[in-house]
């Protein structure tokens, strides 16, 4: 995708209704799309790094479905997880995406195997994780690249392991960095209630 092209996702963002709030050092932005679905994002007010992204679709009967966490830690209370049958063993691998300004990054906790156990590859527009002992398999979807119609490049994929956590990183293409910079410029122009805007110029 060239920087001059406009993707369907960019058009969707442009046409969405949005509100912004500066609170507790975070810039909170809420989008409502034409199909009734929603997206909620939170950014660090100083660094402008994305801290959280959640999405929610509208049900066929018009009711709102549960929020799906795309970036950040899930904040579903443990009691609620038990009630809706989502509670898993505390020893099961847990995936969370924690991005940086120049990387997409995933942390997969409760993976005790040494680093030479893991094999990562790019398959069908996903990052695929396998272990040589065949005890773990996972596909990671890079939604930001899909929305901007960009391909994954195996050369930009790295990983490390420490404290029973596998850390998978993918360097953001320049097209993504430019998109995020332009988006933040627009978000800073939204009328926000709350704290004084401290976001650094990108």
Regions found by a protein language model. Name each.
Residues 1-106, 171-202:
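N-terminal low-complexity tails
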